[in-house]
Amino acid sequence: MTFPDIVPELKSRMPDLRGRLLANESLAPLTWFRVGGPAQALFTPADEDDLAYFLSHLPEEIPVCCIGVGSNLIVRDRGLPGVVIRLPPRGFGEITIDGDAVHAGAAALDKRVAEAAAAASISGLEFYFGIPGTIGGALRMNAGANGSETRDVLVEARALSRRGERMTFDNFAMAFDYRSSGIDPSVIFTGAMFRGRIAEPQAIRARMNEVQAHRETVQPIREKTGGSTFKNPPGQSAWKLIDAAGMRGHRVGGAQVSDMHCNFLINTGEATARDIETLGESVRERVKRHSGVDLQWEIKRIGLG
């Protein structure tokens, strides 16, 4: 699908824009599933000031969506109308240390934040080592693993409103819940401050190595996948419910339920976004019939089907 080109009009409104603004840019290469249609406009800001300028001059009727590295995302096949914003590491990926505090931009990889904390002998962020996303996504969904979550270590988050106004949220204001936060979807996170505790670096590194070894053993990390597909229901594991329903290895087109971990869907090579989403809905339907549990998507699905 090709959208009407809105880029010339937007550029005329924003003569001082420094970031890159492209029309009808494919989003498939920007997602781990490697599927999906184009963005009507794709904006890569130079830095936070540039993003604030862009948002303050963007007509309110134009929808906005922000993506990270695309590790927890299905972009539907017909793409997204409006503007998709992708925060680059340059300008949004800096990580700094201040005592037992870690400051990270929204485009910083979770794994790099864990590594920076470990190098500074700061414990508490080891769980990020096994999460294949960015800090912006971690803030949005209260990312967690191995019994720890973002809300356990967050002090405050920085953000911009849809109109480009700067905002700050403390831990309480984030209204975290399991794999979610209470912040309006129109808000774009730009960075965060975390606090850990000083500990022996060897012990921190050992825990991170355990996280990585476990992940390589039980997750299909070398496949085209979006990570955990469904949230774990209270007191239960999604993968066990999926396995019990007989869906391990089940396929729709080029999409497959991973044989290695049932809560991972994979693109075997030629899948469409429709294949993957249809497979996910088939899993939900089968689990509902088998166990009565209504699995909820953890992976974000956006765009026109």
Swiss-Prot record:
It catalyses: UDP-N-acetyl-alpha-D-muramate + NADP(+) = UDP-N-acetyl-3-O-(1-carboxyvinyl)-alpha-D-glucosamine + NADPH + H(+). Its EC number is 1.3.1.98. Pathway: Cell wall biogenesis; peptidoglycan biosynthesis. Pfam families: FAD_binding_4, MurB_C. InterPro entries: FAD-bd_PCMH, FAD-bd_PCMH-like_sf, FAD-bd_PCMH_sub1, FAD-bd_PCMH_sub2, MurB, MurB_C, MurB_C_sf, Oxid_FAD_bind_N. One of its GO terms (biological process) is cell division. Its cofactor is FAD. The active site is at R179, S228, E298. Gene3D superfamilies: 3.30.465.10, UDP-N-acetylenolpyruvoylglucosamine reductase, C-terminal domain (3.90.78.10), Uridine Diphospho-n-acetylenolpyruvylglucosamine Reductase, domain 2 (3.30.43.10). SUPFAM superfamilies: FAD-binding/transporter-associated domain-like, Uridine diphospho-N-Acetylenolpyruvylglucosamine reductase, MurB, C-terminal domain. GO terms for cellular component: cytosol. It is found in: Cytoplasm. One of its GO terms (molecular function) is FAD binding. Keywords: Cell cycle, Cell division, Cell shape, Cell wall biogenesis/degradation, Cytoplasm, FAD, Flavoprotein, NADP, Oxidoreductase, Peptidoglycan synthesis. Coiled coil: none annotated. It is an enzyme of class 1 (oxidoreductase). Its main location: cytoplasm. Residues 35-214 form the FAD-binding PCMH-type domain. NCBIfam families: murB, PRK13905.1. HAMAP family: MurB. Cell wall formation. Belongs to the MurB family. This is UDP-N-acetylenolpyruvoylglucosamine reductase. It comes from Nitrobacter winogradskyi (strain ATCC 25391 / DSM 10237 / CIP 104748 / NCIMB 11846 / Nb-255).
